[in-house]
């Protein structure tokens, strides 16, 4: 082991570090470093920062994995240590083995400057002073001992048994936090849970869109269209919530000066070193540094170091072994908020009192002028005593600070993984953190009305944060975590025992205790003659010196609207007034809620406070624990379920709501004026009856049959003012305008209007305003854009730094591409609820307006008949209904708690009474004292009396305390009893209101027409009634409990509701329910209520009908815990009524690591919220998942099996996601690759183009601008499929519109754009795809082909085809062909008859073994056959191009010409009739005329290359020698058969269309005579001499008709210019034919 230690300082650090190099397993970059923050073993980079693989021991955790510049980056594991389970074998140091004489401290200083000068300081055993050598060795032994202990612990962490006992995370890390897919291990149940992590927390997606819609509607869910960058914004807010949560809270403070501990010995002072400007270290003069001076800690941070070599070596790893100063850091943040629960930036810190103590001690140290002693003082004998005193003083101060730091180290850090324990610790230790977290939850999870920060109602898709709960081995949401915190209980505790936290008039209390009992507090409040705006709180009265107590607004939060609260303005009451509606399930009608809270708080204030008496903590704790029984345990689940149920009701029933303005005017006449108000709230719809000036707390419940609306559970829309809230922690809140619930399935008639068609000029740096697309587009415009784009790219590259050229290019390009996407779709970005894409994505008909204006998109809705109820939808509604209307568990819990409390109090009373009796008996009586005085013979009576009196007083104080304890104990039970009556009364009233809403919904079901419920069982309504029947039965039992009697009014309300609901209950199998005022003897005992699931659970058991299998588990809404196996999707399900439910996977709250599996299972709507999340990491995960989706769809012919409706929905969703997602690098290419796979099976391509052409324009602009990103060639391939010829693409009219939007010249410019960077493979692919689009357009339209020809683009297209980069044919697999009999052969190929797709075809198989075969010729012939299309040209069916091997084949598949070649027809039917001659000649002439019109020259026209079908139609074939006429150069004469070639071709001159006319004349000679021309000539030399020099012509028989003979002579004219054109030949043949 290397014993040499070095002290160095990285450039970014403000202090030195102590390190030790090791070489056993790692190269020279391996170091071990010890610090106050922990111990590191691993690699360091050239800047001495952690880089590469390494392990760091934090105070309470261990990270092992990849590092990047001091940040956890890459793959790694964080172990959350359990200190009590860490077994560490401490090795015996060498200093302990040495004799005391050798370890004795020397009194003379050590001079280490020779080893420190000019290099990093080191500590070795090679000292020059023998007297100090032993001391240095002892120091090094101590350091080695520490390093060995840490290494031992690191080795222990790699053991499987050790890991099994720890909670740990294993996965991806970015910037020191868990980011990406990772798994978390719970040690208690040894389970692994895979999730998607972001910034140290788990992110899951809550599908709040109506799940019934996918059953009926294949279009894109409209509610998801407006969601953009939700996750990105949420995580930015989350970073503000947990601000300051770093691994090393200071500026790079992962190590501090190691000499802080060494300086305790005067002999070791010279180890200090200073930081030079260049980042190196140099030795300093001997000095003593205070704990607050540099380099011990960075400036402006209050901290104090713990020693590396602690005086108590045994405490090194005992929870605070590393003594991290981070826990004591506290950067003060100023805040204008004075309340105890205020919103502010918070970070982990110690309590304020601890900070103040540390600051005071530091100030005292700084005020000591002699604390910093220079070297001259140290070396002066006269100052030795003073130096020693200061040294001792410093040691004592360090001990004090160390103890404080050890205490502050209990404040936990997350170290990249935020757990529930971490958040709870911050909630308990930071007063402001609770408000910060509440505001975050109110914005992103549950809109808390008391804080007036609801989340955006237009966001139907939201992401939720979950954190691991190591105590319960599950994941818990933030809203449920808040309910588990003790903030509410702490405030109640303070309100109970602190007399300054409550204002209670003693006169009112006396009056109350004399005239009212604790059991009639609610009656006392209801009998007040004041209105709600002038209510006197319970326990208070008007005094002569005070104004009437009114419910006044409290002190507002920053930007939050005022809230009415109690007459008192104490902070505790104001905060409880805000927290009680959050934590308790209260009636959310505003004035009823205020009254309920006022009653609760005033009951708390009845707890007496006795002067000079502090009650035992357990006494007020009983009240706090009792209130905890009423806290919400499933806040998030209930909110999401109620929201989902409301959406389901709106989907099946037209939303109706009765609203009225509350009557705020007092009725002085006393006449009862009734005003009914319906309030839509988060939990329920509450109806309040206001009678004159008196507000009744109890509401008479009207019969369900008389109700006209169903509005419970409530929607999340609340009539709150729209305000902007800016908090000090950086989270911005703005309450959006209230929107109505989504209507029932509408029919849209859309008129689209935009300001302008998106044109390329928006991104043109020259700003010339030229449009790229449209009928007015010009070639110059497209060319200039491409040139400008090249210039921009070059300029950007030239402006980058040389050192970081590649990185800067990538970053700049990414930023520019993102800005480009946002600029391309400005219309889509600006619109919200009336989004253009909302209309584009509808499945109904859409009319596009040709006139564009600046107005927004208008959507007119037409009512449509609601969907029919099926068995599946009924079961979903039933499950939602049961989960939305539940019997409160708090009633049972509170009752059980109260009964146990009564038993405990009775026992305590007996014990206290017995103690009081015993103590009273021990007190001496007065008679005994007098007798003792008489017997006292000495004069000690006064002393004796004083002694006895003091003891008597002590006994009296004990008696008073016990009596007070007994009184407080009794009072606490009375308060709990009163609270029980108050809370149960409120709960029963709230449940009755919700049951009224439930029965209204049931009546709606009963009133449905038979046509909508024809598929349902006759008794389907009974299932709903059974559930409400069970709840009312339980309410009845609770109200009639003999142990605690409630008010008779509550019982009357329940009886009245039963009577009013008798019609519904009569439908139950047991018949009608009867009641005799207060009895319900005829009600059968229902099944016990459904138990509540564990607190942190949230899974999708509401919708288990989608899941793959069935079970008999209870209908509870469990939050989805990940399956331990990461390879399979959670298929747990619930048995519904009935059980015949179509299986299929679905999760209400989806773990994002399973998002691809759910998408592959058919839930394509989940793509949109992920794509629009704005989180690049999550989008990249889905991008990789799309690869698996394509593989899944491609295998086993799944694309052919998928339904058309599902395919349309998937296609539309993917296409829409490309607009709302701006991730060009990974997402857009993968999406369009998937669209390319789906497009051939898309049944409505014409409608697709009409809907999305505006989007296609935008992406075409992006394609032109952003070629280097790898998106251009993919998008061009997509467009190429869209314009495929015939029925595979758009119809002919839409292709014309396509060409108007995307001019031909645009694709020609892309195809001919020079490739500057040879390494850019995408550029070549882009050229090929542009050529492919031109090919498809040319095949589909002769006009496009002529335009391509006129722009001289056919040659480049064929060149691309020649190399197999583009194809003008259908690609046929060899396995698809069935080769039959042989038909013939030529020089390069043989022809067979074949079968393809059940039809007869001709298969031309090229002979690869032939020396003359060239693949280029084969591909060229295929391309020519594919490009041209004419009735008199051989029709190409496709081609088979197999990989070149010894078994490979290259085949062309054409239509089968049954009669063979024209030569064979001539030979069989010689001589031909004039009619046949004219027919064949005219057919060939028409085919050649078409070829010449598109600048093709056949170059081998003869009877052997003309084919005849069964209808005697002649068609030109064998295009192997065809060439494209290029005006820029002459074609060579190396062409077809010499005897048929023109004289100029034989002479080597240019080959033109006139050459084909000459060959056509020779073919006409064959038709007329039946003979081959120039039979007498046998050599090419003789042929050339005869034809070129002698002007020899073939001899025409006299039997040939004159006009045929004349036509032959004209075609064989020696001068090409005097030969007729093919069109002239056609005219002559047609004239003679007529």
Swiss-Prot record:
SUPFAM superfamilies, A to Z: Histone H3 K4-specific methyltransferase SET7/9 N-terminal domain, Protein kinase-like (PK-like)
GO molecular function: ATP binding; protein kinase activity; protein serine kinase activity; protein serine/threonine kinase activity
Swiss-Prot/TrEMBL catalytic activity: L-seryl-[protein] + ATP = O-phospho-L-seryl-[protein] + ADP + H(+); L-threonyl-[protein] + ATP = O-phospho-L-threonyl-[protein] + ADP + H(+)
Membrane-crossing segments per the record: 1255-1275
Entry GO terms, CC: cytoplasm; membrane
Location relative to the cell: Membrane
Iron-sulfur in keyword set: no
One biological process term in Gene Ontology: signal transduction
Membrane topology listed for this record: Single-pass membrane protein
Alphabetical keyword list: ATP-binding, Kinase, Membrane, Nucleotide-binding, Repeat, Serine/threonine-protein kinase, Transferase, Transmembrane, Transmembrane helix
Ranges of Polar residues composition bias in the record: 110-119, 340-351, 716-732
Enzyme class: transferase
Family annotation (CDD domains): STKc_MAP3K-like
EC id: 2.7.11.1
Main location (coarse class): membrane
Region (Disordered): 84-131, 273-367, 658-750, 783-816
Protein name: Probable serine/threonine-protein kinase DDB_G0282895
Organism lineage: Eukaryota, Amoebozoa, Evosea, Eumycetozoa, Dictyostelia
